């Protein structure tokens, strides 16, 4: 029994030694890597900065970029072990500059390297390209907040949230929205509230992974709404074959021919 306790303590201390925890209420450029067109978002005056992390630039068709935490994060004790638990939350907004909306969307990403040279704009969200889309050696996972229906990716709509592994085709996707529970008589009833991701409104997202049962949950709601008790997406997917020992976490986004802003306003992460 004593040996088991010592082994558990050693494992706990090893995991704790590599734990990462941060909370950005806004962004000033420190602790971030800017790839492609990602930048500190401009304010309406065009001179000062808004405090947001922006993935795209209005004046550049098919603009795309990635904004990553400056240091790699340890997601596993080794490349062959099970991943650690992790959770992240952030507020974001997607604001089209033209009508109809030209897309494309924003994503939370976990990628193997701080390098987006193999990424394209448009429907590839600044993450993949036509050649590497779907390849298992990509070793990446992302949660997409998609604002344009791309038939080649089998998108369910132009306003959805999806879990993607190595591919622009989502493993699971749901229309954007959140669940609320109300009392009808003596019964508690769930009802679904639609949201428009490209309304320019700020939304908050919560993404959680629990290693012991490989449970993934994604929840979204308007910024001023308390975290819903029922996730938008929940399910199990073993990530041992996807996550490497050390990877980068952050955001990616892209637009089509016309302007669309993809801004992240705050971000917290913990593993």
Swiss-Prot record:
Q: What does the entry say induces or represses the expression of this protein?
A: By oligogalacturonides and the diterpenoid compound sclareol. Accumulates in response to mechanical wounding, chitin, methyl jasmonate (MeJA) and ethylene (ET) stimuli.
Query: What gene is behind this protein?
Result: LEC
Identify the stretch(es) annotated as Legume-lectin like. 20-270
User: What InterPro entries does the record tag this protein with?
Assistant: ConA-like_dom_sf (IPR013320), L-lectin (IPR016363), Legume_lectin_dom (IPR001220), Leguminous_Lectin (IPR050258)
Keyword match Glycoprotein: yes
Main subcellular localization, coarse class? secreted
A GO cellular component term found in this entry reads:
cytosol
Instruction: Give the function comment from the record.
Output: Plays a role in defense responses triggered by jasmonate, ethylene and chitin.
Q: List the disulfide bonds.
A: none
- According to the record, the signal peptide region is 1-19
**Could you say which protein family the record assigns here?**
Belongs to the leguminous lectin family.
Q: Which GO terms describe its biological process?
A: cellular response to chitin; cellular response to ethylene stimulus; cellular response to jasmonic acid stimulus; defense response to fungus; ethylene-activated signaling pathway; response to wounding
**Gene3D superfamilies tied to this protein:** 2.60.120.200
* Tissue distribution: Expressed in rosette leaves, inflorescences, roots, leaf veins, carpel heads, and silique receptacles.
Record the organism: Arabidopsis thaliana (Mouse-ear cress)
- One Pfam family of this chain: Lectin_legB
Q: Which GO terms describe its molecular function?
A: carbohydrate binding
Give the UniProt subcellular location, in the record's own words.
Answer: Secreted, Extracellular space, Apoplast
Q: Which UniProt keywords apply?
A: Apoplast, Ethylene signaling pathway, Glycoprotein, Jasmonic acid signaling pathway, Lectin, Plant defense, Secreted, Signal
Glycosylation sites recorded in the entry for this protein? 79, 129, 151, 196
Q: Supply the name of the protein.
A: Lectin-like protein LEC
- Work out whether the entry's keyword set contains Lipid biosynthesis: no
């Amino acid at each position: 029994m004593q040996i088991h306790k010592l082994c558990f303590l050693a494992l706990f201390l090893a995991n704790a030694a590599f734990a990462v925890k941060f909370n950005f209420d806004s962004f000033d450029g420190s602790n971030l890597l800017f790839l492609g067109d990602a930048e500190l978002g401009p304010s309406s005056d065009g001179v000062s900065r808004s405090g947001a992390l922006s993935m795209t630039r209005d004046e550049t068709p098919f603009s795309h970029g990635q904004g990553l935490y400056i240091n790699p994060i340890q997601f596993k004790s080794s490349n062959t072990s099970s991943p650690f638990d992790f959770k992240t939350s952030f507020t974001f907004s997607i604001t089209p500059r033209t009508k109809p909306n030209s897309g494309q969307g924003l994503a939370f990403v976990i990628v193997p390297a701080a390098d987006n040279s193999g990424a394209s704009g448009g429907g590839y969200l600044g993450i993949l390209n036509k050649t590497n889309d779907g390849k298992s050696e990509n070793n990446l996972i992302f949660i997409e907040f998609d604002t344009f229906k791309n038939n080649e990716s089998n998108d369910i709509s132009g306003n959805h949230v999806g879990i993607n592994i190595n591919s622009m085709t989502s493993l699971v996707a749901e229309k954007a929205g959140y669940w609320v529970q109300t009392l009808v008589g003596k019964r508690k009833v769930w009802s679904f509230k639609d949201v428009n991701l490209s309304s320019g409104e700020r939304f908050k997202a919560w993404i959680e992974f629990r290693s012991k049962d490989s449970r993934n949950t994604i929840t979204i709601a308007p910024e001023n709404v308390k975290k819903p008790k029922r996730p938008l997406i929940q399910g199990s997917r073993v990530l041992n074959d996807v996550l490497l020992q050390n990877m980068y976490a952050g955001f990616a986004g892209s637009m089509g021919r016309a302007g669309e802003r993809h801004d992240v306003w705050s971000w917290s992460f913990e593993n």
